[in-house]
């Protein structure tokens, strides 16, 4: 958003996945790193205001204590607390609650970014599918319930989100519409294959019809001080 020329760097329509998957593969090759998957932090080991590690729950439910001289506390997201979120539903801010329990200061927990365009789902237990803003950079348009444009699609995320919420309230609807038919079909299928496929699975043929969109919680910038 907030751009007047095409300047978004992306990999198809899965930029985030492309970056994180490459980083993850690089970390797995490091000889001094052990990765515990499907593992939850239950508590930290703390004495006299010093952290000595963490208590974790493995996938099979067993509890273990991991001792450490240094502990980096990466709290993760809070998307599971929202009706619509691009985050996984199990991200509910547990680490922030633990921080408060141990009297650890938090910072910027009011810094929550709402992405203006995700595919609208009535099932609130499902993770919201992000419709990349790069499609708007390529010419996609937004419409109200009467199929009238109501906003400049290239506004910054916060302003566009506000405009969409205002239109939804005005129309008494749960979503607005996005029209990707302004983008040539070959370009759609080449540049945004995952969006096209996901919408197809949801019963919408992107090259032929509009899709329902709703803003959703996306990034959480706060955490431990």
Where is each model-derived feature located?
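Catalytic cores of large soluble enzymes that bind and process phosphate-bearing ligands
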Residues: 11-19, 33, 46, 60, ...
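Thiamine diphosphate
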Residues: 87-100, 106
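Conserved redox-cofactor binding core of oxidoreductases
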Residues: 1-62, 69-70, 74, 118-122, ...
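Flavin (primarily FAD) binding-site architecture
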Residues: 73-87
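Short hydrophobic core segments
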Residues: 66-76, 99, 147
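An anion/pyrophosphate-binding glycine-rich loop and adjacent beta-alpha core
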Residues: 98, 104-219
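Short, solvent-exposed loop/turn segments at the edges of secondary structure
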Residues: 3, 75, 93, 135-138
């Amino acid at each position: 958003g907030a751009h007047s020329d095409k300047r978004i760097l992306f990999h198809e329509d899965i930029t985030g996945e492309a970056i994180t998957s490459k980083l993850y593969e690089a970390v797995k090759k490091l000889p001094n790193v052990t990765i515990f998957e499907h593992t939850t932090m239950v508590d930290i080991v703390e004495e006299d205001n010093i952290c000595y590690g963490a208590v974790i729950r493995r996938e099979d439910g067993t509890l273990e204590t991991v001792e450490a001289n240094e502990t980096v506390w990466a709290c993760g997201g809070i998307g599971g607390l929202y009706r619509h979120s691009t985050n996984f539903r199990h991200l509910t801010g547990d680490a922030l609650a633990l921080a408060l329990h141990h009297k650890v200061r938090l910072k910027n927990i009011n810094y929550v970014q709402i992405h203006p365009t995700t595919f609208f789902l009535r099932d609130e237990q499902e993770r919201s599918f992000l419709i990349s803003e790069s499609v708007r950079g390529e010419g996609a348009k937004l419409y109200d319930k009467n199929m009238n444009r109501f906003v400049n699609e290239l506004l910054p995320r916060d302003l566009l989100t506000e405009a969409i919420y205002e239109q939804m309230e005005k129309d008494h609807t749960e979503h607005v519409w996005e029209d990707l038919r302004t983008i040539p079909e070959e370009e759609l299928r080449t540049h945004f294959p995952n969006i096209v496929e996901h919408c197809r699975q949801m019963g919408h043929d992107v090259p032929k019809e509009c899709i329902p969109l709703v803003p959703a919680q996306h990034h959480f910038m706060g955490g431990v001080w």
